């Protein structure tokens, strides 16, 4: 399983990178705004800065929702750096654009996926990644993890190469359940990733070891 961090915060990206387990980054306009990154030039420069920290894929999202606009923005993003993956919304023109990008050799991440049917269309169009939002489905009393299972079954049935990138991951149990189901990638906040480090028995065991070590002189 690949680990992506879902943030535009450079210090958090660096911290995750320093752990040695980071495979990539996902961003979106909301995360950019949260970091106070505004204006086209600043946003593009920020994407480039992220690419200098990590060695893996960096998903950069288009703002446009029409085919021509998505293509224009996507081509500009893809030209920034070889690590950039163009993040495209699951809409009609988005699917058309994903097929266009696929034919041009530009990698894509189909975002805002909430059904297996949407994931199937994204794979047919040649998306590199598909991003089902499990946390948002859970918020609606739906089962986000079941969606991952459905997509995994469909993709395995037809040997689709599109990778399942579980998004809207809220906590460590989401990560673990996605790993059991067979998601190819999870993207999560730093707190969820570092949360995997923690267990009360680890803390108490370490405290005991350190106490015993002091007795040794």
Where are the predicted features?
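Glycine-enriched alpha-helix->loop->beta-strand junction motifs that scaffold or abut catalytic
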Residues: 20-24, 80-84, 100-109, 124-131, ...
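Conserved, mostly hydrophobic/aromatic
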Residues: 28, 86, 122, 178, ...
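Alpha-helix-loop-beta-strand connector modules within alpha/beta enzyme cores
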Residues: 44-58, 95-108, 144-164, 207-217
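C-terminal alpha-helical cap/extension of soluble enzyme domains
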Residues: 155-217
